[in-house]
Amino acid sequence: MQTEEKPFKIGLALGGGAMRGLAHIGAMQVMEEHGIMPDVVAGTSIGAFVGGVYACGMSLKMMERFCYSIYEKDLMDVVRPRQGLIGGARIERMLRTLTGNRTFDQARIPFAAVATELERGERFVFQEGPIWEGVRASISIPGIFVPFHTGGHTYVDGGVVDRVPIAAARELGADFVIGVDVGYRGGESPCDDLFKIILHSMEIMEWQVMQRRVGEGDFVLAPSLLEINPASMAQAETCIRIGREEMQRRLPELQEAIEKKKAELAARQE
């Protein structure tokens, strides 16, 4: 008796890295140009932002244009620093607009946003309710953004526990997961203002956790972004270009890995 062949699903796990995460856009553009379309997407921090907006239907070209038109001041509503430097009201309005107020079950493709539940210190995967809420929770860098409060819980940046959400992509049903790591991976990084100090402290912690998980993805892209200021939109074009170039360079390796995984799964089903 012949069993019905299960569709092969590609998952995309977009990691955190503040503004360096704009490299996700370039990497995804190359994938799309070569017919490698994700069936599911999971994101952490800036990866949740890019992945959430993409899952709601915004084209990568439109996303790129948006990045060139926005400045840090458009995202910042500075508050008295009791829980964070930035209140988050401006970015919440922007997220509602960019996602069209869609809920997770209204997304064009299955999407999950990874955050950290602060009270219990645990990874939390948003898959229900408004997408903007999951993204807002996931991007809440401790000390910079006021934490996101919903359902009686407090959430901060998902990178605290899971910088590149490979496991979340698998939980969405992916057979093959492409991880994109845009965070710090060693080396000297300038820390000459408060934002950079907080961000780099987070990056160091995330890197220590990430090193133990680097082998979880079927393919992990890690563009070199150390020279990019993670607290500024000024290098958006450079960041996107680096993402494109690195994915283009490793494209044959990715294509080969996908075909190999397909063959392995087909052999198991025989």
Predicted regions and their residues:
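Patatin-like phospholipase
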Residues: 1-44, 52-270
